[in-house]
């Protein structure tokens, strides 16, 4: 019961208490003095000032203003104290007697009123007397004012047995009230609309606003001296106290109900509430009646009025709905879909949004009593919830009614935005910002209506029970702030990002970019159509870009029969217009499968076809390539290097038959820690070694058959027996397990690890069998020529999928090159292997020699922090090599590597150079590149300072070379050139992302 007691009663200052006690005495004697109502009014005004100054606090008001406020406040306080003292001198009654008389009369009153109201309700129910909507509204105003007049009169007179003069005065007041209420409500609404339009015209003119506020204040003060001031103050009290207005605003947003249903429900509700009342409450209210105009009285009045006004509202809301859409477009733009009167709509100023988190939390708790009152009531009264069917129906009606306005508002360019707005609304407040933006309809989503989060539920009773007067004031000041806030659209958008919290974290498909989300939600949130600002331009450009992406997507879909097209209507999904990463992955995977089916035996034929396209002139370029090859392979720390027939290996006796060299039986490990492999031996009692594949920095690899698995072929990688290599081997084992667990269906083209074991103190890893690596493929089929564009496209798709999996597992491979990419027998499927250099993305130690040199990204060379971009760079270099058969950057040193990269892309950005730890090795103090080369004659190092480096290497010419390409292939080569340009950006921040690469035309469009 204590929860229903408004905390405002507790919060009011002491002098208010004294003031109120004086008033209750006057009420008992049936005399309501002029200065009392004036007093009441001035108190009301004082509070209002207080509230405004609270808001102005955020607006950095000047010292003069503050002093003025202070003086004003003190003047009122002094005035009040004097009045209170005078009044208390006049009165001589003991407080105890006063209370008893007052409260007995009140209780008696209330009982009789309840009986009267019930009878009235029953009569109305029987007769169903009210028909027309306008009549209803008028009647609502009349009956409301009548009740108010009567009830206040009774409360003031104390007993029913008081003199006749008081009743006549009551009648006069009733008529007075009727007229004044009508006139005042009309004039006020007019004033408000005029006020609002004025303020919109003079955006940012705060001084003007202040003057207006002062003017309106003085007017009200003048009014308070007029004879009808008593009825006015009553009317104001009614406005703030009765929940009917609050309910009406709720009804506007809510659904129209049948009046009959409404009456029955209201009766039931009335009964329940009456039953709940207990003597304890009355006891408590008795004590409180000294301090305020008996809150029990007010509460009961409001309850009765609430039940009576329900049936009026149901029809009234219909009429309001009809009227509202006829507002001016500008008004619509500002108020969004929620067309309420300004005093009633809880808006949020941008200032509120940019509060500190703590303040924001507090203000959120205390803010919008209306909204929360409505929420708490909805959750508490089951009678108020509609069936989902009816709710949906009325919602669709509402939407139809709103559609023409939206069309009128949106210019042709902003139409996609409207679609998305519609979609956002349908997605039931998918973005957390929706909750706070004034342009959103608040009680639209059925989810919110049905249930509230426990936090909000626990908070709402506190918010609900706020003093009616303060509620009224806060509502007014909020509307004032909202009007001002329109001039600060830009600020609102900037500050909104601070409030943002990811409510639906993980609901989007993985890999979806955060930037895309925020741009589709944030920028489209509440967009002023009139303002053509920076945000609008950016937004339109984004939409145009998306349209281009869509165009490519549909082109791809036309040729891609195997993949079902994504629903194209923007309303069908809450995602951004571009296809989701998962859809892209599916499409690419399907492409790879199709390529595998179609090209089982065509690999060699396609390579020969490419050879035939080349002209005879090519031969003179091959000698240079041969010179580079040894350098390339000395760098090779590959587990499958096709180099195992070297003199060193033969000298070590590796690969010889077991019987030929029986001395090796006891000596399993050579001087460098490599395992001495013997053909025919059995490892771990099950793997029968039948062939030797090769040797890398960390290990050597053998082919074997698994006796335990029906002689299934496997590859066994035997790690070198030394501490560092063992450590590296265990790390690789960990990463492989992680990758395999993340890809149970083997869609992402990373090598599968079957198991591991130890053999003669060597860690052995058992892999799926694959025939050769891409270095061998290039050597065998595409020496100096490269592979067919079809094969390169398929390989690039598979490599990007592998990168996608690595990123999901937060792993950097850090050694991608043709040597570490294995292919199957038909050369259609590839797998990324050798995770010996891999690391977790967070453990990226800065070292200038990470990754094989030709595939090393510039950020590694200059010692800048790096991430997934280094693997993307390596893939770019590999793709170029696969198509041309030539190494893209065959640098002899890191310095030479930088020079070659800048020959292709121009000078490295200064911003990037400054971040490099090793920048001084390659750049001088003015950030000019120092090219270090060896003089051919003197064989001494010479340094050439290059302030500007212009791109001289033509990628397209290198890709096409001397080929006479048919049109379809030429188009694909142009696309490959475009993709490589984006992959090989010197600044990793500007480099293409994996998702973008998967959406690139080269990947998406078939040949």
From Swiss-Prot:
GO terms for cellular component: catalytic step 2 spliceosome; chromosome; kinetochore; nuclear speck; nucleus. Residues 1-104, 141-535, 560-583 are annotated as: Disordered. It is an enzyme of class 2 (transferase). Its main location: nucleus. Phosphorylated by CLK1. Autophosphorylated; phosphorylation inhibits interaction with its targets, such as PRPF6 or SMARCA4. Residues 40-60, 68-82, 180-203, 215-231, 304-315, 342-367, 438-497 have a biased composition (Basic residues). It is found in: Nucleus; Chromosome, Centromere, Kinetochore. There is a cross-link at residues 100, 112, 118, 171, 178, 593, 659 (Glycyl lysine isopeptide (Lys-Gly) (interchain with G-Cter in SUMO2)). Residues 158-169, 562-581 have a biased composition (Low complexity). ATP binds at residues 693-701, 717. Belongs to the protein kinase superfamily. CMGC Ser/Thr protein kinase family. Interacts with CLK1 C-terminus. Associates with the U5 snRNP and NCOR1 deacetylase complexes. Identified in the spliceosome C complex. This is Serine/threonine-protein kinase PRP4 homolog. The gene is Prp4k.
